[in-house]
Each structure stands twice: as structure tokens, then as C-alpha cells.
Amino acid sequence: MGNSSSTPPPSALKNSDLFKTMLRTQYSGSVKTRRINQDIKKQYPLWPDQGTCATKHWEQAVLIPLDSVSEETAKVLNFLRVKIQARKGETARQMTAHTIKKLIVGTIDKNKQQTEILQKTDESDEEMDTTNTMLFIARNKRERIAQQQQADLAAQQQVLLLQREQQREQREKDIKKRDEKKKKLLPDTTQKVEQTDIGEASSSDASAQKPISTDNNPDLKVDGVLTRSQHTTVPSNITIKKDGTSVQYQHPIRNYPTGEGNLTAQVRNPFRPLELQQLRKDCPALPEGIPQLAEWLTQTMAIYNCDEADVEQLARVIFPTPVRQIAGVINGHAAANTAAKIQNYVTACRQHYPAVCDWGTIQAFTYKPPQTAHEYVKHAEIIFKNNSGLEWQHATVPFINMVVQGLPPKVTRSLMSGNPDWSTKTIPQIIPLMQHYLNLQSRQDAKIKQTPLVLQLAMPAQTMNGNKGYVGSYPTNEPYYSFQQQQRPAPRAPPGNVPSNTCFFCKQPGHWKADCPNKTRNLRNMGNMGRGGRMGGPPYRSQPYPAFIQPPQNHQNQYNGRMDRSQLQASAQEWLPGTYPAXDPIDCPYEKSGTKTTQDVITTKNAEIMVTVNHTKIPMLVDTGACLTAIGGAATVVPDLKLTNTEIIAVGISAEPVPHVLAKPTKIQIENTNIDISPWYNPDQTFHILGRDTLSKMRAIVSFEKNGEMTVLLPPTYHKQLSCQTKNTLNIDEYLLQFPDQLWASLPTDIGRMLVPPITIKIKDNASLPSIRQYPLPKDKTEGLRPLISSLENQGILIKCHSPCNTPIFPIKKAGRDEYRMIHDLRAINNIVAPLTAVVASPTTVLSNLAPSLHWFTVIDLSNAFFSVPIHKDSQYLFAFTFEGHQYTWTVLPQGFIHSPTLFSQALYQSLHKIKFKISSEICIYMDDVLIASKDRDTNLKDTAVMLQHLASEGHKVSKKKLQLCQQEVVYLGQLLTPEGRKILPDRKVTVSQFQQPTTIRQIRAFLGLVGYCRHWIPEFSIHSKFLEKQLKKDTAEPFQLDDQQVEAFNKLKHAITTAPVLVVPDPAKPFQLYTSHSEHASIAVLTQKHAGRTRPIAFLSSKFDAIESGLPPCLKACASIHRSLTQADSFILGAPLIIYTTHAICTLLQRDRSQLVTASRFSKWEADLLRPELTFVACSAVSPAHLYMQSCENNIPPHDCVLLTHTISRPRPDLSDLPIPDPDMTLFSDGSYTTGRGGAAVVMHRPVTDDFIIIHQQPGGASAQTAELLALAAACHLATDKTVNIYTDSRYAYGVVHDFGHLWMHRGFVTSAGTPIKNHKEIEYLLKQIMKPKQVSVIKIEAHTKGVSMEVRGNAAADEAAKNAVFLVQRVLKKGDALASTDLVMEYSETDEKFTAGAELHDGVFMRGDLIVPPLEMLHAILLAIHGVSHTHKGGIMSYFSKFWTHPKASQTIDLILGHCQICLKHNPKYKSRLQGHRPLPSRPFAHLQIDFVQMCVKKPMYALVIIDVFSKWPEIIPCNKEDAKTVCDILMKDIIPRWGLPDQIDSDQGTHFTAKISQELTHSIGVAWKLHCPGHPRSSGIVERTNRTLKSKIIKAQEQLQLSKWTEVLPYVLLEMRATPKKHGLSPHEIVMGRPMKTTYLSDMSPLWATDTLVTYMNKLTRQLSAYHQQVVDQWPSTSLPPGPEPGSWCMLRNPKKSSNWEGPFLILLSTPTAVKVEGRPTWIHLDHCKLLRSSLSSSLGGPVNQLLS
């Protein structure tokens, strides 16, 4: 190869990027030698560029024998021969010897023979090689740095573009000459390539090469770059379909003719820049096209046969820099092949563009029948992919959860309970299971479908269920019920072979069917008989036997499904077991055990039987078609019934819906059979009905005789009685005889005397003894307390004393009894006693000691437990009180003392500790309730006896009435304990279900207290209760109505109580599981244990977050949720191992550095509680029960990295950084300053060209230095809108708001943990909005007040100086001396100013009229606004100041515009224009229009008077009343006014609740009277009645003083007389207008316009004429002025502010208007115009436009 030139060392040649760059340039095709050598010298400065050595080295390379080298070397040499022949003459001489050396050494560096040839050089060349190697390495380092910054990419593309242009020009010249020769040599391989869509002719690429020779190896491959061994031939023009269009691409691989037949060689030809641009356009858009990206890249690389270098070249064009950076570090090293690189880039895209998942749509996906399981899963795959952007194979757990949760609830529960390991199964394994359970569900749904039919008395038809009797539902509050058994006729059995002398009906010999004596006595619905015992009719379903009759196994064979009565009676005697279940509803008379009676009750012809109801014998119609028993209120004989409040609408015999009222349980008797039922009462029914409910309860059998009689057969009845004959029967009385009588409390006031030393009570040091006087007690309460205090004194519980202390007592009457109990208010004593540590365990901890194996329970209630512990004499003085002049004190622990529970519990524990080893059962003690739980009955009885004997010996008293002895179901601590677990008491369920919607605060508290005790049974108690608790904090008038959200929460809590599950008793020997979740404001969890392979709940735990926790990111909120749930669960697990299931990496969050979002104390609590050794955290791989139970969960997020997500969410934007951005668009410095009570903010910008700083923003303001810093940073963000910016600040507060705390405060509503607003919350909220405006932003913290010459130091100093100057930027007031100078720069007049400056003189570019300046039109508004100033000067002041220096024709109009748009002036200025007052329309007659109002007359009853005034005549009606409510108003109208004066047309009143109540409005609506309500807060709207109120009170006071009467009601008639007789302004009195004559008084006895001697007709005619004249006189005096129309809807107004912080508030948009009132947006009531101030734009159309329209 030659030794005249040095060779780069092999280590340098291994740089594949440089090598590939050289090859792309070297083999471009048509570049001159000089340009190639210049480019090579630029890339490799150590290589010589003598072109003369090119021919020598090329010739040496061609002459090397191929058989003397290896196979790889032969491939290279063969390629060089091809290139030499293809590039004849000048083209061949362009390749340098060093290029050939690099090519050979770079591609065959593993070949030892070739390496030795290249290293044989002269000794002088070796020294040069050493130097060149060092320089070459340095050059490579610089090249790598340049490649990282991507600076050389644009230059290389430009070079390639120029080369391509030169190549195209050269080829166009030779096309005609070579075309014919090419067709002759290569007729098959020559292809015509059309011009591509990027405008470049590429047809010469395949034809520009001359034929060359090759060896037997046509697939040339040199380092995977020069040729492609994968494809021997690649078409030069490929068409790729994209969105229906054809795009043609040229290849980076070219086919060159070899000259040996049709063989071609593939030579690499890099992508052109224009081709790369086209490929970038065709690439799927990011991030939407990430799912199609891998397929598109693979297809493109396969078509072009690209290698790793081509992938990198294409990646630089289509992928952003962050994606390429991520792709380079995914596997920690370079990808092994092209496919690996493609996969790396796709993975990097998914990391850089995280999928935005619509989890709401995914969670809402549900199964839609009749889909199969396979169709359902396929549909789920489509929904999951479309809404998450992920294939389900990449998110298996969320997809499986989505599929399982979308199934019907019953199918989901069956799937999870029947397959505990379902979460570990795959989708193909789950599909058969889902199909199985879906099939089961469809079959169950088909069974329960029923045909509707309206039944009588509206009760569902009960069905017979095997031998268990009638089973069905009972009526609810629904108005109608329509159910029917879906009966199908049973198939008739074949007649079989019946002997000729045998009856076909009864199968008895001796007669035939027609003469069968049993036919007329057939029972109804027996066998296959038809209705009424007739054969062949529609058959009834065979009904089973009564529950207490057990037929033999062969009864069907024996009787063939048919029986008559005699057979049934005989069989009953054989089948009777002697006893029947205790739950049997029949209450039989007590007879000897074992006896039985069968009763036949013969009905009358009217199908009636005699029934005794509450000792009243009545006839009742037997109706088997009636569902319910009904008592008729209109019958001849009606029994006494106690009715309830339950009422339904039922369909009776009349086929019309009739109301029925439910009666309380009533005892009825038929013959000797007694039963308790709850009949329904119909007051309009004339007969009594004995329905199917009572007949089925008595097991009655109805049959019909041949003569038409109907017989009711009552089966045998038996007694229920307790006996000790069986093993499981306990005689309680005999068992309790073994205990002494002093153990039992005989009276409610009986107390025990515990054998413990008296208790000494210590008080705090320097505490003053309270002495609170007893307020007087009413006589009835005093007499009610006297027996109680006397009894307590006789027992020594109370003693008389003289004490410095005294506290009051309160008598409380017992519900339903004429007795009182005493409440002693000891709060003052509780405040002075020394504190004690409470040792009373919670009910939850007490019950946690029970084991699931304990099935027998005994509950012992200690009577008056506190009173059994004595108090030392030295401490008794503390509890003194006064009663009837005597002072008493307690000698025992009193109720209400803060330490009574603790002291009693300590004494009881000490007492029971003595028998600790004598009892093997579990003992639970809570205050005075003792529970004994045992595994078996005998142990329980034995330990109970030991306990009771010990209590008797220790001086306790036990309540025998409350004793629950040896039962499997007991009531303890308000819960029902059973072997299965804990249940809610049925009485509590009934109380909750019947609880009406609360309308007062007290009712809400009562409801929350009722359901709050059962919160462990309610999965989402805290979520639902918070809506009701919000109402407690509101200051709302009672009664109120709950909103829709509160009603929904109320109903959900009721439903949760009524459908509560059974909670199992925790087993300490088994591990616990805690499934956790959380909503936005509450934590949710369920504590479970596995029993018999099933996960069963122990308790549902929920708790509300505080303000801090509510604003945390989801992952940290999960930590808070688990911590709260664990705190509640500790009372159950008691230190046992616990497995916590969660979807968050809790341990990772706690073990990393402490987050700035959580305080150190809170984080320490989390670490101490959540990192305990007995806790195990498990990632949920299945659907958490907490998620299934919780319907309000808002935190469902896909799988994620908790640390990364917390870091991302804690900032206002994900790309926010604190590191400088390279080459930003702007570099800003912000700073704030505060001094002498004033603040200022400034922003300066760095100019890199001149390296200086300019001020781009300055503003005064800021109540503190922190506020000024926030304003400065917000201004900097606003100035960098849509730009990349680096913002430097020296404020740690502003930096922390942006990076650490601001986003967290925004999430929790800018409040502290105490609920108070955060300081500067408005500025922080504004800053968080502004920081979203830049395209990319980095906020960097720098040190303040440092010295140096760096850009950061100088920029911060400039910002600090600008902020200090901004403090003193104030609004200057224009003065005469500087008026002209201040406007020199803006005095630019336009064409519109010509008409305003007419006649003015121009001086120095300013128009003057005398000494006054005529400003330009555009300046006028700014000048007047400045004069308006901070103090908001009025129009006269503005005009006066303006006229001193300026003049303009539009000045007054502009001032009006400024004042009309100034919000502050509109709020505080008085109303500028008085309004013409309106009047009421003239009524048509007297008492057609009334005004009413309440007025308070005194403080004693009757306190109020209802004043009613006739608007036409002013006739007053004043009625005293005790209350001012709606019922009083309705009573007076209906009993006094309307009967006396008739129905009015209209009634007016204010909007008091007594007038707006529903009863008042419905009353007037029903009688056709219009009730008009006046505008609130405007007494003049009710002026007539308001003036009457004032007159009335004044006259009452004067009359009382004149007549010396104390009661105002006594002088009211005289006042009414005077008011009705006094003439008004028209000269007529109300009496004259109404009666047609003056009222006769002492002074007017002889005055009358009528004559007594007239006839009746004449008198009436005169009276009519006189009334008409009076009425016309009233009409003439009535105001007739008309009011202008009201403001137009759509205009704006201000409303009077009642809070007086400003005179007016608003503005408000007017929606509707009348001449006197308006309806505005946001206010529910009409507003009188006296309370409105219309904006000027609403009154004058000339002032309604913008400024430019106003002044044009």
C-alpha cells in the first residue's frame, strides 16, 4: 500500500461516527478532488492531503492478489476495484491514500495480516505517528463535544446539499451521452426514476454509474456501512402508503452496475436533507402517534435497509433532544442493532410523553348484556386502548381491574369470592370464569321475572316456599303494588290402569267417580284439581303442608298428591312431632303439652265467620283473594284499634284506590286459636275482610261443600312452654335461686357498697372553690325531685352539710312518666380537680378481646355503679348543692364528675382481679357492663355463677331485669353479639329508617349521633357525613331545607345502616389485612381477616383529612390516609401482624429525604407509625375492597412512580426547573423592596450583546417585602409569555412558593391547618397563574448582596437598585409649570383633532387657546383620569382643575364617562337623581284590595296584632293574636275577614315567613285570591298598613292613659271606632265609604242623609246613589299620574349595600323591570328602584359607547 504517508492509529480509526461522516462525504459521487481533500482535512487535520499520492495507492490496492489475503480483505479490495472502475479519470484520483488506509484498517482491524502491512513504515514516520495520534485524540474530544451540542449537524447537511446540487448538474450534462450506452449494457437493471415530490430529479442516481467488475461475492459488506448483505437488490424507487396518498422516496442505498452481466452492487448513499424533511412530515405526530411509531420506523428502516447510523441520522430530525437523551441512557450502553435502537426511541418517547389516560371513562365501562365474556373483553380492550393510550398487555393489572369492575355486581362478587386467586390469573384464564358466572346470573334473572297483576289491598302475593310456609314481602310506602305468582299448570299424570270397580277420583273400590262421596269435600288447590274442586279446570299449583307438619317421605306415593280432609286429619296425627319452632306465629291457649285440637269453622251463606278482635266479636268476610286483613270503619260493629302513622293507597273490592291506615299489633281469636296481627283500617268500608295474610298465618284450609257451604279448617295447634326435660333447656328462675337476694337490685335507687377504701379527690394548687347559687325551681319540679332526694338521703347517698362549694342542679322529667331525674352541673368542680390518667378502654378495644370461637354470652349490668364507690369525708364538700333551703352533698361518686368513670373502673378491676384464675371464659368490662364469653354453654353457666357470687360478696348490686343469661345473641354496648359476629341492633335500624329529613340543627346532630355510633358498619361514613356537618356551621334560619347533595348523603347513610353487613370478631391468632384508599377529603379503609378461605370485614374505617392533608399530592395523601386508618385499626389488631394493601410505594416515600410538602413533626409521626416491624406493605394486584365499597373515590391513578409523581405534582408545572436553561430567549432578574411603609417591585433584563442590564418593569406597591418579591416574580413571568426564560431572584420566600409550597397551598384552598387564610394568598395565586405563561421557565435562587463581576451578581444588584427606586414611584399631580413639558413627547395631533383645534394657535407643536392647552383627543381621557386621582374627585372638582391649564370641547362628556365607569365612585357616591314616586292602581270596590301586616303591641300575651286595611276605603280591621305565624293568618282570614267582607281580589304584604309560608300561599291560591309580596327592605311599598301601625300604637297608648286601662285589648274597640269614623283627605270616613252614611256618634245623632220614613226600595235607591257618589269622590282624589317605564333589561345598576362597608354594591345586570322594581342577576327577589342606582350608560344612550365612539 506504500509507506510514504503516515497512517492514523487504529485506536483513532475506531471512532465510527467520524468514519461514517468521512464515507458519506467521500462517496457522494461527483465532487472534485480539491473539495474532498479540503473536507477530509477539515475533519482529519493530521492526514496529508496530497492528491498526487492517490493514483499510487489506488493502483497498489488493485494489484494486491486476492488469494493472498483473507476473505474479509478480499471483500474490501473487490469493492475498491468497483469504485476505481466506476470513477474513471479525475473521479478515481479524488480518493486519497489515507482514505483507503482508514477504510481498510477500520473495517478489518481484526485481521492480523492486514494490520501488519499497514504498520510497516519508516522510523521517521513512526515518530510523526506518535505526535499525530496525540493531536488526533484531542481533535476527537473536541468533535464529541461539538456533536453533543449538535452544532455541526446544520453544517454537514448544508455540505451534503451543495454536493447533491453539483452532482445533479454534472449528471444532467452526461444524460444524453450515457443513456444509449446504459441501455445496451444494462437493459434489465436500468430503471426510470420519476422526480419526487420534493422537487429533485433522481432518475440519474441509478444510471450515472458505469459498469464495473466484481468477484464471486456480490454481497459486499464492510463494517455494515458500505453495502447491505441483507438485500442483494433494493428498488431505487419505493411507494409508501400514508393516509391514502402515495409518497415516493429515494434510497440511501444505490444499485451500481458491476459490468458482469446483470449483477449490481449496493453502495451506501446517505439521506438527502429534503428527504429527511419529507420523512419528518410523514412520521406519526408526537405524542399522539406513539403507538404507530414503532411500526412506521421498522417499515421505513426495512425499505431503506438502514443501519444504526441511518437511524441516528433520522432520529436527529424527527425526535426532540430530550427523547434522544433518554434513548441514550435507557440500557446504559449503545443499542446492539437497529431494532434495539428503534425500541429505545419508542421507549424514550413514552417516557417523555406520558400517556394521558381518561380513567373516568375506563372506570365507567360496564358490561352490556347479552354480550359473551369474549366479546366483553374485546370491547374492553378497545375502550382501554382508546382512553389510556396503552396496550392492555403493558398494563395488565389496571386492565383486569377494569374488566372485573365492569361486570354486574353479583357476578363480580361471585367471581372474587369463588376464586380467591383470581388476581393472579391471566385474561385467557379469567374469560371462562366470567362466562360461567354470567350464565348463572342470566338463569337467575330469568327465574325471578313475574307477570304483574294489581291485587286487592295492595299486598304482594305471598308464595309457598317448600315446607317453610308463606314467604313474601309486605307493603312499603309505594302507592300501588302489582305482583302475582307466575303459576304454571302442573302436567297431569296419565290415568294409568284403574280397575273397573274402582273410583277414578279417590282410587277406592265400590263406586265410580260420579258417585264419589269425597268429591264434594275436596280441598282447594290439592293435587291437579281445578278451581272449586272441579276436574278439568285450570289447575292450581300443589301447595305444601304447614311448617309444623312434617309428612313422611313416602307420602306422595301413599296419597298420589291428593288428599281429602279426613286423610289430612289422619295424616296430621301421624306426622305431628310434638313441638314446633319457637318462631311459629300462632299464639295458642295454654293447655297440657302434647294435646291437639282440629277445628272446623262453618261460615255463613255470605262466607263470613265470627272473629274476636280485642274482645269484640265481629263477622269477617273470608276472602282468599285479599292480600291483607282490613277492618271497616263504617261497619255495624267496629273493634277498638290503635292506629299508627303508616298509610298506604290500596285497591279494594270497589276497584278504586282507597287509603288504609295500619293498626298496631292486635290479638284476634277464632274458636280456640289466638294470633297477633296488624290489620289495616279503612274508615269508609262497611264490612270486615279476613285476608290471606291472617289465613296463612293460622295455616287455615278453605274448602267448599256440595250444598254451597264454605268451611275453614284450622289445623291442630300446640303450646309453647319451657321445660327442663331436654338438655338445652335452661330454667332461669331455678338457676338464679343459688345466689343471695342482696345481689339483686329491687328498686331503681338501690345501690351497692363496694369493699374499697373511700376515694380522696385532690384539687389543683391555688384553685378557688366555686360557689354558684341555685336558681329558683318551679313548684312542679321541686315536688318531683323531693321523693328522689328523700330516697337518696335515706340510703345515705346524700347527706346535709355546710360547704363553701355549691353547684346548681337541674330537674329533667322522664319521658312518658310523671317522674323526675336530677342532673348535677359539676363543670365548675371538674375545672379545679387535679387531672387523672383515664384508664377506661374504648368499646372497640373491649370487644377486640373476644375470639371467634366464643359463642355463648352473658351480660351483667351493675345497678347504680358509681354510687357503690364511697368518697372520703374530706372530699365530700366539693359536691354540695342546695335544695329547698338545705345544702346536700354526695357521699359516693356522683354522675357528672369527670373522674367518676376512671375511679370506678379502677375499683372494679381491683375487685374482679381476685377471681382472675377461677374463670376460664373471657371477661370484658366497660364501665358497669360486664360480658362473659365462653366456648360452650356449660362453661358460660359455670363462670357466670362464679362471677355473680363474687359480685354479691364484694357488695355490688345487679339488675335482674337487664340480665342476659347464657345466650348466643346478646345486646352489649349497643351492638348485637352473635357467633357470626357483630350486628347493628334491629331497633336502631328501624329508628334510622324512619328518621325524617332534618330541618333543624338539633335534628342533624341527633341523626349524626345515631349513625355515628355505627360508623364501623358504614364504608364511607366520613365522606357522607361531611355534607351534613357543613350545615351545622352555617348560620341558617330554622326550619331549613337540605340541598340535593345533603339529601343524597342523608339517604346513603340510612341505606348503609339498613343494609349493614355482619362484622366478624377479630382473631388475634390470624394476620390482619388492611385495604386502604382515599378520596379528596377523607381516608377510606377496610380491616379484614380471612375466615374459611373468605375475606370478611372486621370494620370499615374512615376519617376526614385536615386542611394540610387535603392539599397533599396523591401519594403523600395516601401516607396520611394509611396513617389515619392504622390509628383507628390499632384498637382492633392490638399489636398483631398487619398486611397493608395499597397502590403506592409507602416505604419508598418514607425512606427518602423528607419532602418539603410535609412538616418535620408530621413526617416523624408517619415514620414512627408506618415503619413498625409488624407492618407489611403489599402492592395491590387486585381490586381493593376499599375501592369496591367506596363510590366517591377520586384518586384512582394508573401505576406510577410515587417519588417522581410527588416531585412533579408538587410544582405548578412539570418542566419548572431551578437550573439555567441553555440559550434562553430572555434572562431576567426580579427583586422587591419595602421601606417606610411602602413597597416596590422591579424586573431587569440582561442583554447578552452589550452585556448590560435594562429596566423593563417597575411598579410601586406591596404591603411587605415578601409581597413585593411575589409581585416582581409574577411580573417577570408575565413579561416572558411564550418564551424561554431564566429568572433569577434572591428571595427564598418567592423561590419556595414556586418550587415547594405554592402548588400545595393552592390545592388546599390557601388556608392554614387552623383554617385561616394564608398571608399573601392573593399574590401567590396570581404568581401561580403567571408562571404558566412562559414557554419554558427556570426560577433560580441566587445569593443577595454579594460582590463580584459575574452576570448573576451584577444582575441582582441592578434589580435591587431598580426595586428601591420603584418604592418612590408615586403618581405626580400636574402643575402649571410642568404642564407643557410633561406632554411634549406625546403631543401628537391626528386628523380627528382638527375640528377641536379650530381657532387655536400653534406654539411649538402645541395648540393653545389663550393660556390654555388644547390636548389631543387620545390624551384627554388620560389627563382627566389622572386629575380624578386617588381620592376620586367629583365632576365639578375635575372640571375646575382641568380648566386651569387645559381646554377641550369633549371634556365634560369624558368626565361623565370616567365617573360612569369608576367602580369605586359608583359604590360610594350617593344617588344622583331622585325618582318619581309611584302609586297603587285604583281598586274596583271596597275590600277588593287588602294590605296586612303584624305589629307587636306589648311583651305579654296577646303580644301581636294582625292589621288588615282596605286600600279603597282605608277601613281597618285589627285582631289581637298570641303568635305571628302562618296558621294565625289563615285562621283570621277564614274565620273573620272573608265571612264578614267576602273574598278579596288581592292581598298585599311584606315577605315575612308568616306570609310566604306554603300554607298561606296554598290557601289563597285555592280560593282564587292573588297574594302580592312587596319588595324587601322597602317599607313604603306597604305604606298604608305601615302608617296604620304607627297610628294604632299611638292611639292605643293615648287611650290607655285616658281611660286608665292596663290591657291594650280593652281600649282597642274604642280606637277602632275613632279610626273608622275619622274622615280622610277626600272628606269621607271609612264608615261612609263602606256603609253609605256617616257613623252615628254623640255629636252626629241627628245627621243622616236618609230618612226613616222611606220605603225599603226608596231607601236602597238612595243608599246606592249615595255610595256611588262617595266612591266617585274617592276616585277623583286617587292619584292619576303615570310613571315612566322602568330601565331596559340588559342595562346595569348598583344596589344599596346593607352591610354599610360602602353605600352601593355591584354592578348587577338587570334581567326584568317594572316602573317601580327590577329583577337583577344573582338576587332571588325583586328590588325596588329606591334601592337601585342605575349606571349612566343605562340612562343616556349618548353615553353608552366606548371612548372612541363617545368622542368621535
From Swiss-Prot:
| RNase H type-1 domain sequence ranges | 1222-1368
E.C. numbers:
3.4.23.-, 2.7.7.49, 2.7.7.7, 3.1.26.4
Annotated region (Disordered), positions in chain: 168-222
User: Which residues are annotated as active site?
Assistant: D623
Q: Where is the lipid attached (N-myristoyl glycine)?
A: G2
InterPro entries listed in its UniProt record = DNA/RNA_pol_sf (IPR043502), Integrase_cat-core (IPR001584), MLVIN_C (IPR040643), Peptidase_aspartic_dom_sf (IPR021109), Retropepsins (IPR018061), Retrovirus_Pol_polyprotein (IPR050951), Rev_trsase/Diguanyl_cyclase (IPR043128), RNaseH-like_sf (IPR012337)
Swiss-Prot/TrEMBL catalytic activity = DNA(n) + a 2'-deoxyribonucleoside 5'-triphosphate = DNA(n+1) + diphosphate; Endonucleolytic cleavage to 5'-phosphomonoester
SUPFAM superfamilies associated with the record: Acid proteases, DNA/RNA polymerases, Retrovirus zinc finger-like domains, Ribonuclease H-like
Q: Where is Mg(2+) annotated to bind?
A: D1231, E1269, D1290, D1360
Swiss-Prot/TrEMBL GO biological process terms: DNA integration; DNA recombination; proteolysis
GO CC, one annotated term = host cell plasma membrane
Activity versus pH: the note is:
Optimum pH is 7.0 for protease p14.
Cite the binding residues for Mg(2+) 3. D1493, D1550
Residue ranges, compositional bias (Basic and acidic residues): 168-178
A GO molecular function term, named singly, is: zinc ion binding
CCHC-type zinc finger positions in the chain?
501-518
Q: Where is this site: Cleavage?
A: M95, T96, H251, P252, L457, A458, D584, P585, L722, S723, R1372, V1373
Its post-translational modification remark reads:
Specific enzymatic cleavages by the viral protease yield mature proteins. The protease is released by autocatalytic cleavage. The polyprotein is cleaved during and after budding, this process is termed maturation.
Which cofactors are required for activity? Mg(2+)
Question: What are the Reverse transcriptase domain coordinates in residue numbering?
Answer: 793-977
The highest taxon in the source lineage is: Viruses
Q: Which residues form the Integrase catalytic domain?
A: 1482-1638
Tell me the function of this protein.
Answer: Capsid protein p25 forms the spherical core of the virion that encapsulates the genomic RNA-nucleocapsid complex.
Tell me what else is known. This protein is translated as a gag-pol fusion protein by episodic readthrough of the gag protein termination codon. Readthrough of the terminator codon TAG occurs between the codons for 582-Ala and 584-Asp. The nucleocapsid protein p14 released from Pol polyprotein (NC-pol) is a few amino acids longer than the nucleocapsid protein p14 released from Gag polyprotein (NC-gag).
Tell me the protein's name.
Gag-Pol polyprotein
